[in-house]
Each structure stands twice: as structure tokens, then as C-alpha cells.
Amino acid sequence: MKADNLRILSENGFSVPKFQVVGPNEDIDFSHFETELFAVRSNDAHEDGGKFSYAGQFLTVLNVPKENVKKAVLAVADSYKIRYYEKSLGIKSENNNSSVIIQEMVKASYSGVIFTSNPKGILNDMVIVVGKGIGENVVGDKEETVTYHCYKEGASYKEGSDILFPEHFVKELEKLGNRIEKLFNKPMDIEFAIEDEKIYILQAREITSLDFDLPVRILDNSNIAESYPGVCKKLTRSFAKEVYTKIFTRLGRRALGKSVKYYEDLFPHMVCDFGGRMYYEISSWYDILRLLPLSSKIIPVWQKMLGVESEKITFSKEKPNIYIKSRLLFSFLYLMVVSQRKMRDLSTFFKKEFRYFDKKIEKEDDPKKLYFLFKEMEEIFFREWDLTLINDMVSFLSTYFAGDKVKKSLSLESKKPAEALNDLIYTYKRFGKESPKYRRKREKYIKYYGDRTVGELKLETRTFSTNPESLDKLVEEREKLPLKIKKGKYIYKRKSLARLSTNNREISRLNRSRLFGLMRKLIDKIALKTVGDDIYHLSLEQIRDMIFLGKEFSDEINEERNMLLIYENIPTIRRVELLGNPDIDFCDVQAIEEDGDERKDFLIGRGVSSGRVSGEIIKITDMRKVLLKDVKGKIIATYSTDPGWFLLLDVAKGILAERGSLLSHTAIVARELKKPAVVGIKGLMNQVQTGDIVDIDGNRGYCKIIKRS
């Protein structure tokens, strides 16, 4: 098998050192070899098979001079007698071929292994392990190694030793790995060596540790990154999973009745975390979307509206039967018809219950009673929150079919915080910070919009509600900029389904931010009586055990602190393909700097807000670290935005984002503010730098770099 694979590689143009296959008693023909030193390797009949690799089970002899090759061949053949590996794994070997491979020795400056899929079960993570010298020293842990993780969507990071490996080889090795995987049509384990700037393939075999009987789980953060940007603390991660489980369970029961039992195992897997970041477990969503009428048409629309880049679709469930499809068809049509009335009712219900719980939390200080209030809020609010998912689907479909008309939508709910802030700044300018008028308007702003900020669904996020002084600081900063006062005028707006559903979507998002703000307030009160800010390093289950059972979690808190530091060094990976539920280790992680020579001057994305402007780039990775005066009149380049960014977008000239879709917050606010916007630009943050001069076209969806800084 090993020799067969080498022949295939050689015949397909890969650089394979010259080799010859001989039996232990055969003569060796050295005439076509060009080196004086050789590697003598095993070629057992069962080696490098589909189920068992036999890695390291038989002898390999390196740096063998010509006169000693025959002796090395006999030694390698003799090692076939040892079959402990087969006995321990219950392998029945019938054909013990005793041939041996004689191969030209590569004088390697570096060598290593490429796993085209992470053997732990991450299918789109190519792992490249490199060390100095020959491969035997690397495999035998005799040399320091560095490990590169190269995701097929572009993100890369490394871990391990700081050996001086020329990193331009990483891209070349990645390309070779992809070519070899495509050639054999399966994940491969590839040994390589580098001599004089040339990469040689020494052997290639199938990765045997991957169990493809396990389900493939696809994680995607295309849209969820707006709500949960960056690394999230443990409490946020556990709460997000619980919320999605409750909401989808309720939606399933509403739409499917008793038939929901066939799909209940999916609901705890709607979202998950990976490397400290939140992801949609999109493979579960596909199973649920498959229930819808015309699902083959709806799923691509849904992918497009959420900004999902890969069109690959996988299902873990069998195709639903006609009864389930019929029931859901009628449920779906009914819910679409009543969706806007239901959304109005939900908003009224929310306001009433919000006032009730706000008063209860304000008066309560006992951690046990506060915890019960938290669980009661979950039950009350999320019991009907599945209606927002139905409205989202209505919004996706109606907006998609409305096309460019939706770009002209006016006066959406998400514009109100910006208008209220302008009013507050005007009051500050006219009456001063200590005036009763300013204090009243400040209190009102915090009441309604105090929790609308960057990362508002992350419970650890500090908002204007938790830190009111930060609002004063913002107002003082904005007061120094010219205030734009827009006179209101009556504009007739046809109440199309696209506009109604999109507006209700924004109302529900604002209500959601207020709800999470109330829960944040409750958690902060529990924290004051228990472990302080460390409460955010605990899961909901751990908080319960701490309050009611008196358990102590100092070790777990310290571990979580350390993991957060590691997570911060992992680049954002847009898509992850997992085989089953693998254990993933992240350690000693360093992001890989992209090669500047690969920059492009013309970047393509999706235009989501009309207009064309030229201007200077300001690159933002954390909006909390920039001042409004630094953004004014410039074009923002970022990974993604969320509702807290409207302050920056208001003073910016335009917006470019690596992620996003027509219905992302970036798009909605940009349209309201009439700022050109292009989203979904792959690799944007590696292509532009602060100070670059660019031309962006929000109609056609491109960014042209005119001058680099």
C-alpha cells in the first residue's frame, strides 16, 4: 500500500524521492539513483490501509550508505515478524508481503507531517507539524516542533515551539495537502521533507483515526457573531445554549405537536461554542429547515440572508414523511399570516412583564431568591419568544423577494437610539450636565436604550445601564462634534410585509437587549453576595450549585481565566466541521500574520446600502478602543458590527465588513443613515490597513484600494 501510494503521487507530478521496491532476496539496481545515502522503509501488505496505519510498527533505517543497503533491507524485512500490533487490535493478516522500499535520502533542513483533516475530528482543520532535520527526529519527539492549524476558510494559527521555520512554506504545504486529499478523495496523513527550498513527499496514507460513522456537525458564525462578538465568558456561553434550546423546543411544539419528539434531540444543538466563540450548529438548522414546504428553495435564501458562505448542506435526519411536511405546511402558512399581529402582542406582553420583573429585582438581594427570579424570567419571556424566529423567517423571505426595494426602508426601530442620543446631546449643550432636563432625559435614555451596545447579549458586557457614567463621557465627546439636526417630515410608507416584519424584527431585538440587560442586573446582584465578577467564569449549573449546595469553584474559575487568554489568541474561524463531539485542545496559540505580498487592490463583497464614496480607512477590531473624532469622516473596516456600533456609523463616511448580510445590523443601520456599505468581504481585515485610501460602491458591492498607507 505504501509503495502504491508513492507511485500514484509520482505519476501525478508530486516531488517524490526516487524509490525502488525489492524483496529481501532480490538484487538491488542502483543505476537510476543519484544519491549515495538511502532510506530503507517497510512496505508491509497491510501497512497504510484504510482501517489501520501500522505507523511506526516496522523498522525504518535512514542515512544508509550504498554498501549497507542490503543489510538494512534484511533488517527491515525481519521486523515484519513482530505482529503484536495485529494481536492487540484483533487484526487477521493473511498476506504478509515482505517487500521493502529503498528511497533516495533527502537531506532535510525541515521535515514533518501534514494531516489534511485534524485527526481529533475537525474535518476542515489542516494540521501541519514541522521540526528541524529529518522526519524520524520530529516524529520521535527528538526535535522541537511547531504546529500550524490552517482552516479551509482562511483562518490560521500556530502553537508550540518558536523554531525559525520559513512560514511561506506553510501556504505551499497547505496547497500540497489539498491536492493530495483531492487525488485520493479522503483525508490523508502525509510525510514531507524540505531540502534546498524544495518540498518532497515521502509517503501518504489515509488518516485511520476518523470515524465517519459519527455525525458531521457544521458550525458557522456568519450571523451569530453580530450578537456574540469575539470571545464569550462561560456564563454567556452556557446561557446562550439554554436560551436557544428553550426557544426551539417551544417552536417545535407549536408547529409539530406530538411529532416534535422526532426532532427534540436537535434542539440542544442549535448553538455551541468553539474556541470561546459562539456558533450556530448549522447542521441542526438544516434538519429543521428541511421540514418547511419548498425547503430546497428556502434553504439557499436563508443561507444568503444570513451571509452563510458555504452552500454545502448536510442532514442528520431522514427525510420527513408526508404527514409531518403537511402538518408543518399548514402551521407555517397560518403562522406567517398571523405573524405581525403576534409580534405586536408579544411586544405588549414584554413591556408588561418587564416592568414587573424590574421592580422585583430592584427590591431583592437574596441570591437564592434572585436565582429563582432568573429561572422564572426564562420561563415567562422565552415561552413566546419563538414567535421572533417565525417573524425572522417571514422577514428573510419577504425581504429577499422585495430585493433592492428594502434598501429604501425608512424610520426603522433601530434608528430611535441614535435619535434619542442626539436629543440628549442637544439638551447637554443647551442646559448643561447638572440640569434637571438633562438628568431626566439621561435617565430615560438609559431606561430604554441603556443596554443597546456592542456585545449586548454577552452577560459580562458593561453597558450604560451598569455604568451610567460612560454615557456622560460619550455625550461630552459627541458634544465637541457638529450636531446633525434633521427636521422630521411625513413620508408615506406602504406597509409591505418586508417592512413590517423587518421593523418588528428590530423591535424584538431592542426588547431582547433590554431583557438581557435585566438579567445582567440580576446576575450582578448575585455576584455582589458571592464571588464578584468571577461569576461570569461559571456556568448556570455551577452558579446554582454554588448558591444552593455551597460548592466552591475557585479551581474552575482559574482554569477558565487561563482558557480565555488562550481563546483571545485564536483567530475567528468562520466555519468548523466536526466529526462527532471531539475533545479539542487549544494551547500556546499564536495567530499567523498573512503575507503582505498576497494583498489585493479590488475586494468584492455584497452591497447592502447604496452610494459610492472615497475616503480613508480606519480599521477597528474593538470599538471601545476608538474615539468618535478618530472615526469622523472615515470609512470603517471591521470584522462585523452589532447594535452598539450605531454611534460610530453615524459619524463615519461608509462601512466595510468581513461578515454580514442584507439583514445584518450593519446593513440596516447603514441604510437608515444613508451610508454606503459593503459586507461579506472575504479576508478584508488582512487586505486593508488604517490610512489606506479606498473607493467603495454600496450598489455593486466592491471596495477598490486607491492608495496604501
Describe each region flagged by the PLM.
Residues 1-101, 110, 358-366, 615:
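N-terminal beta-alpha lobe that positions the nucleotide/phosphoryl donor
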Residues 3-4, 57-83, 107, 111-162, ...:
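Extended active-site and interfacial segments that coordinate phosphate-rich ligands
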Residues 5, 190-192, 224, 285, ...:
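Extended, hydrophobic alpha-helical segments in both membrane/secreted and soluble proteins
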Residues 37-39, 59, 99-100, 113, ...:
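Structural motif
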Residues 94-96, 156-194:
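A long amphipathic alpha-helix within ATP-dependent nucleotide-binding catalytic cores
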Residues 137-138, 173-183, 187-188, 196-212, ...:
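Acidic, glycine-rich flexible loop/linker segments
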Residues 167, 182-188, 198, 232-236, ...:
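Contiguous hydrophobic, helix-prone segments at protein termini
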Residues 480, 484-502, 517-521, 594-651, ...:
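C-terminal accessory/binding modules appended to enzymatic or scaffolding proteins
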